[in-house]
């Protein structure tokens, strides 16, 4: 592969993404080894760029209005193995190695732990670690 001349501006890969009016894109975190869906979070341009640069998931917290490095308080980082963009360019898929085996703030492996049974949402997956132990009690 040839190097590009220094004076040629390369297109920004972030420009290919269809961002929401708020400048966000939904991101799905998937276990790179077994395909389990771990969580969904939002990313802005900066968080997605940092995720690629640092090799660890960085999201945008809408409630806190700031960057959120996954695992910064729990230790349950997500190491980036692959990143994909869907056919409409409006959803990002992060294939990750989930450190500590817990992706959800409830202490479960996945945020998708509820299943619809007889018209009710019921918990289908166990708590691996008490969230108070992970984050401390209020």
From Swiss-Prot:
Keywords, ordered alphabetically: Amino-acid biosynthesis, Cytoplasm, Histidine biosynthesis, Hydrolase, Magnesium, Metal-binding, Zinc
Pathway it works in: Amino-acid biosynthesis; L-histidine biosynthesis; L-histidine from 5-phospho-alpha-D-ribose 1-diphosphate: step 3/9
Cofactor(s) demanded: Mg(2+); Zn(2+)
Quaternary structure, from the entry: Homodimer.
GO term, biological process aspect, one: L-histidine biosynthetic process
Gene that encodes it: hisI
Protein name (Swiss-Prot/TrEMBL): Phosphoribosyl-AMP cyclohydrolase
Residues binding Mg(2+): 86, 88, 90
Organism field: Marinobacter nauticus (strain ATCC 700491 / DSM 11845 / VT8) (Marinobacter aquaeolei)
GO-annotated cellular components: cytoplasm
Function: Catalyzes the hydrolysis of the adenine ring of phosphoribosyl-AMP.
Pfam families the UniProt entry points to: PRA-CH
Cofactor descriptive note: Binds 1 Mg(2+) ion per subunit.
Entry's Gene Ontology molecular function annotations: magnesium ion binding; phosphoribosyl-AMP cyclohydrolase activity; zinc ion binding
């Amino acid at each position: 592969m040839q190097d590009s001349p220094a004076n040629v501006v390369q297109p920004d890969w972030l420009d290919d993404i269809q961002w929401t009016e708020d400048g966000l894109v939904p991101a799905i975190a998937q276990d790179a080894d077994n395909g389990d869906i771990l969580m969904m979070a939002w990313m802005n341009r900066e968080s997605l760029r940092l995720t690629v640069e640092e090799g660890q998931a960085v999201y945008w917290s809408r409630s806190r209005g700031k960057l959120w490095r996954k695992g910064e308080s729990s230790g349950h980082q997500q190491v980036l193995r692959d990143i994909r963009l869907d056919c409409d360019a409006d959803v990002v898929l992060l294939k990750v190695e989930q450190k500590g085996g817990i992706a959800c703030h409830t202490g479960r492996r996945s945020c998708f732990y509820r299943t619809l049974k007889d018209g009710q949402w019921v918990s289908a997956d166990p708590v691996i670690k008490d969230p108070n132990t992970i984050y401390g009690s209020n």
